Regions:
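Domain-level signature for soluble enzymes in the chorismate/prephenate branch of the shikimate pathway
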Residues: 1-294
């Protein structure tokens, strides 16, 4: 956040004149929208972004105070568009930081018009992967079609008279659709985790986790050596994702989330040691993990 805007916010927020701007991935009614609305229930303007990269850009350019992006789904795995944008933050100039981790228990619903049997049922590939068999068995005459997101699927169902969608039940009222089946899913728990992005320096006192990004020399055992540093300092790793460098596919960058904060002495020692045993090491923020939204 720019100094000018920060001063303006501080001077006028008490009077409610300048609302906070929160960018989120997807359209109104998406799960990112729901998380943003529940995290900032008052005095915030929620800004829809078509692409995950647009959320990063909005916060980077000070067009938004915060951004909400998905990082991982328990059924679908990592959200690689978010991973790639985070890894790009390893390149100077210093970009964003992760301020919080949020999570949402995903409740998939079948949405449509009760008066019209479906000829097409839309959804994102992850819900279709886990609910598709049930939908095909229940509605054998409907074509099951993939959309870019559940919010886009709901929009298609709203614009096509004989189409339904699998998506967020919160989007039904926005698009004048009925909730045909309130809860779809499998026995597996369906949770999506999100990062709250900002440009705040420093480490919050409530921080419990840190996100690191680094590269390694292209030689056997280099990743093991790096992870042994965390083990040595009793730092628990909670997430690791690797991505090949676009200009050199034989080399990888690693995004590592671990327990601990940059203001803790044992973590500082581990960071200093890891600096020697890795390449381009950077902290993308120490943050707290917020209670899951049900």
């Amino acid at each position: 956040m720019s100094a000018k805007r920060a001063v303006k916010d501080k001077a006028t927020s008490a009077a409610g004149l300048v609302p906070m701007i929160v960018a989120y991935f997807g359209k109104p009614g998406s799960y990112s929208h729901e998380v943003a609305a529940r995290r900032f229930p008052r005095n915030a303007v929620l800004k829809s972004c078509r692409m995950i990269s647009d959320v990063f850009e909005a916060v980077t350019r000070d067009a938004a105070d915060y951004g909400v992006v998905p990082i991982e789904n328990t059924l679908g795995g990592p959200i690689y568009d978010t991973v790639d944008e985070l890894i790009r933050q390893n390149e100077p100039p210093i970009g964003l930081t992760v301020c919080e981790e949020l999570s949402l228990h995903i409740m998939l619903s079948l949405l449509g018009r009760k008066t019209t049997p479906p000829k097409r049922i839309y959804s994102h590939f992850v819900p279709l992967k886990h609910c598709g068999d049930w939908v095909r068995a229940r509605y054998p005459g409907a074509a099951i079609l993939e959309a870019e997101s559940t919010s886009e699927a709901v929009e298609r169902a709203a614009s096509e008279p004989d189409a339904w969608a699998i998506g967020n039940r919160g989007a039904a009222a926005m698009h004048q659709l009925h909730i045909i089946v309130p809860k779809l899913g499998t026995r597996a728990e369906n949770i999506t985790r999100f990062y709250l992005l900002g440009r705040h320096a420093g480490v919050p006192r409530s921080a419990t986790h840190t996100l690191l990004v680094f590269g390694l020399q292209h030689r056997p055992g280099s990743l093991v050596v790096a992870l042994q540093v965390l083990q040595k300092h009793k730092i628990n790793m909670t997430r690791i994702v690797s991505r090949a460098l676009p200009h050199n596919p034989e080399e990888y960058l690693f995004l590592v989330e671990c327990e601990g904060a940059m203001n803790q002495p044992h973590f500082q020692k581990a960071f200093a040691e890891l600096t020697v045993k890795s390449r381009h090491l950077r902290s993308l923020g120490s943050f707290r993990v917020v209670e899951k939204f049900e």
